[in-house]
Amino acid sequence: MKKEGILNSELAKIADDLGHTDQVCIGDLGLPVPSGVKKIDLALTRGKPSFQEVLDIYLENILVEKVYLAEEIKENNPEQLAILLTKLSADVEIVFVSHETLKLMNHEVKAVVRTGENTPYSNIILQSGVAL
């Protein structure tokens, strides 16, 4: 049994299989998951686990080169955005797109990780970097 790192077997498998430029979405309770895209449902109850808790574990284990966020988070959830931005290293490219575009982009991700987060626009697509 693993004693550290990502313990959820589905999420660990996705993380282990990521290649350069592969993408994973971490989303809130309400984010729709397109048909055919793997859904890893971590939600236990409203707010648990939080978006930030899941993001922390992901960032500890995966090299990220680019993230996509909904433009709407700036106006509708600035607190979440401020916390999120402190966690990204300076070399991570941040791209803002419309929420509708973000949902369309989810058709191409390796998985959508559903959290218990119940605040608006708490969704991020993380693009894997390469450790060379």
UniProtKB/Swiss-Prot annotation:
Q: Pfam families given for it? A: RbsD_FucU (PF05025)
Where does the record place the catalytic residues? H20 (proton donor)
Name any Gene Ontology BP term.
D-ribose catabolic process
Recorded GO CC terms: cytosol
Molecular function GO terms recorded:
D-ribose pyranase activity; intramolecular lyase activity; monosaccharide binding
Highest taxon of source: Bacteria
What role does this protein play? Catalyzes the interconversion of beta-pyran and beta-furan forms of D-ribose.
Q: Subunit composition?
A: Homodecamer.
What name appears for this protein in its UniProt entry? D-ribose pyranase
